[in-house]
Amino acid sequence: MQSIPIKNVGESRLVDPFQRQYYYLRLSITDQCNFRCTYCLPDGYQPEANKPSFLTLKEITHLAQAFAEMGTEKIRLTGGEPTLRKDFISIAESITNIDGIRQLAVTTNGYRMAKDVADWKKAGITSINVSVDSLDPKMFHQITGINKFDDVMRGIDRAFEVGYNKVKVNSVLMKNLNDKEFEQFLAWVKDRPIQMRFIELMQTGEMDSFFDKFHLSGQVLADKLLKNGWTLQHKSHTDGPAKVFTHPDYAGEIGLIMPYEKNFCASCNRLRVSAKGKLHLCLFGEEGIELRDLLQSHEQQGILQARIFAALQGKREHHYLHIGDTGVRNHLASIGG
């Protein structure tokens, strides 16, 4: 575990040595997932014996309050599959009530959406990202290991019915698996306010051979979009890393997340906390800085914020994926992607 000094630095804002400001926290609330996606957990979730439990509701609330006081405006609940937690609604309601948090998002595999999305909206979830790696039910089953395509599609429709104006859909781009569905995805968003986001496959410790076989640069899709009249949009300060393209003839949008692109890290605006309370400065970085010992009471907030600020001063300018350094991450389910 990395050791970080805890000198109290007062109400420090979340700014790193390269003057990047961090308004966005990705908070994993569980490692558990009920899907078996080929690029993430092909063998399914394997619980580790004698390991710490996931953060409690109280600990999550203390954490979110500390980040909000330091300037965080957006929190995304991730996993694993975050909606597997029985107290998911309580977690959402607690974070929604924190001053300064303007957006509360969730990334989900969508298996519970048709049933529960109305409750998510009531609890304060402002935006939803759903994973849909194929519009072909058979390919969806092959990639996810689960025969739930129709359920996920019903969930997306239900999200619009309960009042969400836009739904973001994530698809991990994989050569010779779903890359040939690009035109089908375009047709799908023609009349639907969906931001369809293609995420370039990322190398992790356990998935080197998979990466070598299936990686495809997102630039291939960017070139197609620009050639066919799509326009790159400007980002707001809380937006994620996606390059978003729009077209006057389409209700939906296309987003591309390309971590191997030059200067990808220059606009970094997010930090990550794992489901067991470790701060991660980069998806492909160190093993994490322990925060959980400072999440036990509100009186610890000042020291907690000082530790977060001190840790941020050690953030690297960029990742080293381009030279094959994936950090210590074996798979993305352990940190929420």
From Swiss-Prot:
InterPro entries: Aldolase_TIM (IPR013785), Elp3/MiaA/NifB-like_rSAM (IPR006638), MoaA (IPR013483), MoaA_NifB_PqqE_Fe-S-bd_CS (IPR000385), MoaA_twitch (IPR010505), MoCo_biosynth_MoaA/MoaC (IPR050105), rSAM (IPR007197). HAMAP family: MoaA_B. GO terms for molecular function: 4 iron, 4 sulfur cluster binding; cyclic pyranopterin monophosphate synthase activity; GTP 3',8'-cyclase activity; GTP binding; metal ion binding; S-adenosyl-L-methionine binding. Pfam families: Fer4_12, Mob_synth_C, Radical_SAM. Monomer and homodimer. Transmembrane segments: none annotated. Keywords: 4Fe-4S, GTP-binding, Iron, Iron-sulfur, Lyase, Metal-binding, Molybdenum cofactor biosynthesis, Nucleotide-binding, S-adenosyl-L-methionine. Pathway: Cofactor biosynthesis; molybdopterin biosynthesis. It catalyses: GTP + AH2 + S-adenosyl-L-methionine = (8S)-3',8-cyclo-7,8-dihydroguanosine 5'-triphosphate + 5'-deoxyadenosine + L-methionine + A + H(+). Binds 2 [4Fe-4S] clusters. Binds 1 [4Fe-4S] cluster coordinated with 3 cysteines and an exchangeable S-adenosyl-L-methionine and 1 [4Fe-4S] cluster coordinated with 3 cysteines and the GTP-derived substrate. [4Fe-4S] cluster 2 binds at residues 265, 268, 282. The keyword GTP-binding applies. Its EC number is 4.1.99.22. Its cofactor is [4Fe-4S] cluster. Belongs to the radical SAM superfamily. MoaA family. S-adenosyl-L-methionine binds at residues 39, 80, 131, 202. It is an enzyme of class 4 (lyase). GO terms for biological process: Mo-molybdopterin cofactor biosynthetic process. This is GTP 3',8-cyclase. [4Fe-4S] cluster 1 binds at residues 33, 37, 40. Residues 17-243 form the Radical SAM core domain. Catalyzes the cyclization of GTP to (8S)-3',8-cyclo-7,8-dihydroguanosine 5'-triphosphate. GTP binds at residues 26, 76, 107, 168, 270-272.
